[in-house]
């Protein structure tokens, strides 16, 4: 199986979630072995996607280098992960990736428009060789060896609409587009009011976020699926795992995970070479599994 990029450049304009200003996003093809590279076109600064360049995980996953930052990269990266794209230039003219509708649907459509192009170099895949776990109180994320990527996520909120939700997701591009891509980010009205008081969430609205008051959902259209809340957490996790720089084969499990815990997990995996092996996708059985997943 070969490395991939996109066939041709595509672009869109949307609003940043926190600053609330228009952002132009451009996706461009890259040659083999270049990886995922972000670029602040307004500053002329290149930000390669690497764990050491993740500078904040409080409200979103934030990439930073020198004086340049790009926030809320996880939804776009989730779609990039699902489409098996290895090499891509992502340019923005402000400090956020556009939030669009709060899910990854728009980015899936954008990648469909761009098309996928095979390159000459063989694809690299990270295979987890032993269990790695990180914790924060009773919250945890872990990853264990497996012959495919699966994500088992549980959330538990003291809210009548959400309560406790769990979903086991076995990755394939088709399953991702059916179950995960449409799941929107969500927040609580009291938190939104606080965030706006400190200059954040200026671009947030019922058009790009599920908003809940103390007892109900404020969005008139309701949920897109029964498990939209936990499926969005899976969407986020796939984006955060893309910081590893390549697709991963392993069983991911999380209880009340977060961007912070996902970032800690990525760094913990890479901290010990015994935790993983980088495979060149030439093993027939594993290549077949990859081709099936990304079909």
From Swiss-Prot:
Is the Metal-binding keyword given for this protein?
A: yes
Name the family the entry cites: Belongs to the LpxC family.
The record's section on InterPro entries has: Ribosomal_Su5_D2-typ_SF (IPR020568), UDP-acyl_GlcNac_deAcase (IPR004463), UDP-acyl_GlcNac_deAcase_C (IPR011334), UDP-acyl_N-AcGlcN_deAcase_N (IPR015870)
What the entry lists under Gene3D superfamilies is as follows: lpxc deacetylase, domain 1, lpxc deacetylase, domain 2
Is Cell membrane among the key words of this record? no
Active-site residues?
259
Query: What is this protein called in UniProt?
Result: UDP-3-O-acyl-N-acetylglucosamine deacetylase
* GO molecular function list: metal ion binding; UDP-3-O-acyl-N-acetylglucosamine deacetylase activity
| Pathway the protein contributes to | Glycolipid biosynthesis; lipid IV(A) biosynthesis; lipid IV(A) from (3R)-3-hydroxytetradecanoyl-[acyl-carrier-protein] and UDP-N-acetyl-alpha-D-glucosamine: step 2/6
Q: Which key words are in the record? A: Hydrolase, Lipid A biosynthesis, Lipid biosynthesis, Lipid metabolism, Metal-binding, Zinc
Q: What class of enzyme is it?
A: hydrolase
**Record-listed Zn(2+) binding positions:** 75, 232, 236
Give the required cofactors. Answer: Zn(2+)
Q: Which GO terms describe its cellular component?
A: membrane
Q: What function is annotated for this protein?
A: Catalyzes the hydrolysis of UDP-3-O-myristoyl-N-acetylglucosamine to form UDP-3-O-myristoylglucosamine and acetate, the committed step in lipid A biosynthesis.
Biological processes, Gene Ontology terms: lipid A biosynthetic process
Catalytic activity reads: a UDP-3-O-[(3R)-3-hydroxyacyl]-N-acetyl-alpha-D-glucosamine + H2O = a UDP-3-O-[(3R)-3-hydroxyacyl]-alpha-D-glucosamine + acetate
The EC number on file is 3.5.1.108
